[in-house]
């Protein structure tokens, strides 16, 4: 089993074992993900957004915030793949996307998604909400 598959298996096991984010398990997930080649880390983490599983996405959101892995895919390609399964409570995904691509690029990509009507307005509206929240916190 490769390191990416082992990481995903451990993530699934953590979600089945614990009813909330377990600090020791999170620390192990950080170590496991650091063994995955840096360019692949985001691709591995993005798989958690395939379905709306809160705990799995919470772990992944914290990993995105902690490790800030690079992302080589264009934002306009990512959003239609990530938004359908994204749990609206996971604020780390919009934070990550704004940090990696910039706030203006994120807003432009959200406008594109809205024009296509593919994801529904609720998801893009919530990303905008989290983005504004980020701006307010940074202004303090």
What are these regions (language model features)?
Residues 82-85, 94:
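Short acidic, glycine/proline-enriched loop segments that cap or flank alpha-helices
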Residues 1-13, 35-48, 69-81, 103-114, ...:
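Amphipathic alpha-helical scaffolding segments comprising HEAT/armadillo-like alpha-solenoid repeats
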Residues 109-111, 121-124:
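Short, surface-exposed, polar/charged, turn-prone segments marking secondary-structure boundaries
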Residues 16, 21-36, 51, 58-69, ...:
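Structural detector for internal amphipathic alpha-helices that build alpha-solenoid repeat scaffolds
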Residues 51-54, 84:
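Structural motif
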Residues 7-8, 16, 76, 91, ...:
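Alpha-helical interaction segments
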Residues 85, 113-119:
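HEAT/HEAT-like alpha-solenoid repeats
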């Amino acid at each position: 089993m490769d390191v990416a598959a082992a990481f995903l298996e451990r993530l699934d096991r953590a979600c089945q074992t614990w009813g909330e984010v377990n600090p020791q398990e999170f620390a192990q997930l950080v170590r496991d993900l650091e063994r995955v080649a840096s360019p692949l880390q985001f691709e591995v983490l993005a798989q958690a957004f395939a379905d709306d599983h809160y705990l799995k996405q919470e772990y992944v959101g914290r990993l995105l915030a902690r490790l800030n892995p690079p992302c080589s895919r264009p934002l306009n390609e990512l959003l239609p793949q990530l938004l359908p399964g994204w749990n609206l409570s996971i604020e780390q995904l919009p934070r990550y996307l704004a940090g990696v691509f910039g706030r203006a690029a994120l807003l432009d990509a959200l406008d594109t998604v809205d024009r296509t009507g593919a994801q529904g307005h609720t998801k893009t509206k919530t990303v905008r909400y989290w983005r504004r929240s980020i701006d307010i916190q940074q202004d303090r």
